[in-house]
């Protein structure tokens, strides 16, 4: 977008779907206000209502979350007939809307070409990737998930014809693979499955990936062959940890045994599972982290897990349901408005040191283009996980499809 558009706009709306986007907005807002002090500023998306008070202190006048499209349209209409200074002090648009909407096909005019985004690597070739969503929100209440404070166990569908038309325009633009960005593709399987069946019918060569929680992989195991038959290449699943006690704290709805069963089912179906993890939590012990590394080795998952997944630290944003656990307040510090989270420390200080060391190691070794196996071995040694098996099962990464930008789930 040319900067002159920012200087001349009456309304500037910033999409804040994730933590990183919100932090980037913090760095940008002073420049925006200096360039156009009279514009009406709006923050919308998942992280907007969670940080409502902070955004308003920064100069944002309207904050919209949940199903935000109608609210954005209403705001734009009001501004078209009313000067910014004459708008009501309190916004009439709901802070969080759960309204069922009739969506329009997204207008992607002016966006960068698909080649500018993350690519898919599979079978030694690279494919251009498109993105769409068949639903928003989630039926579940995992305590650590940023979707939950906004949607509170609700999900909303995007109409099938809108999803397919969005895919259609991206295929015309060169997409060879589609990532479905739904928080959980199986929140509504009777909605989701017909979409991928129609996708495969119209574009037999088009592949796709989805995100599905372990609990749904188990409960809807009969649908896994449908995913395979319609060209699903892999499924991302937020496993988070292999420690059952921590899984209980997070209210994930599965156990380590359940994850291992889901992994077995996926492999039997011929589908790749891409698990994501949060290995560093306030409850993580040193032995639990070492066992986590051993399990990745035993389950032959080293090549399926991006190294950064071995270093992720639990994020506690404003509104996190984890803050409802009384024990958390003894572990956290006051809210950090720059980091947009509550800092915390492990009871065993060695874990905090290890987390930092693992993050630095990964950053350094990825710059050196070290393989996942090489990085994993160094993390193993850093954690003093024991003697590394000389006969460790190695799976060639060339056989596992992956996106060039790892998914932080």
Language-model-detected regions and their locations in the chain:
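Acidic, low-complexity intrinsically disordered segments
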Residues: 1-172
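Radical SAM enzyme core and accessory elements
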Residues: 5, 9, 38, 56, ...
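Short acidic/polar active-site loop segments enriched in Thr and Asp
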Residues: 10, 61, 176, 233, ...
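Active-site beta-loop-alpha junctions enriched in small/polar residues
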Residues: 17, 46, 183-185, 211-215, ...
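Short helix-capping segments at alpha-helix termini
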Residues: 33-38, 200-206, 300-305
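Flexible glycine/acidic-rich beta-alpha junction loops that bind and position SAM and/or redox cofactors
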Residues: 50-52, 140, 189-190, 245-250, ...
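Catalytic cores of alpha/beta
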Residues: 52-57, 223, 283-298
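Radical SAM [4Fe-4S] cluster-binding motif and immediate context
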Residues: 112-272
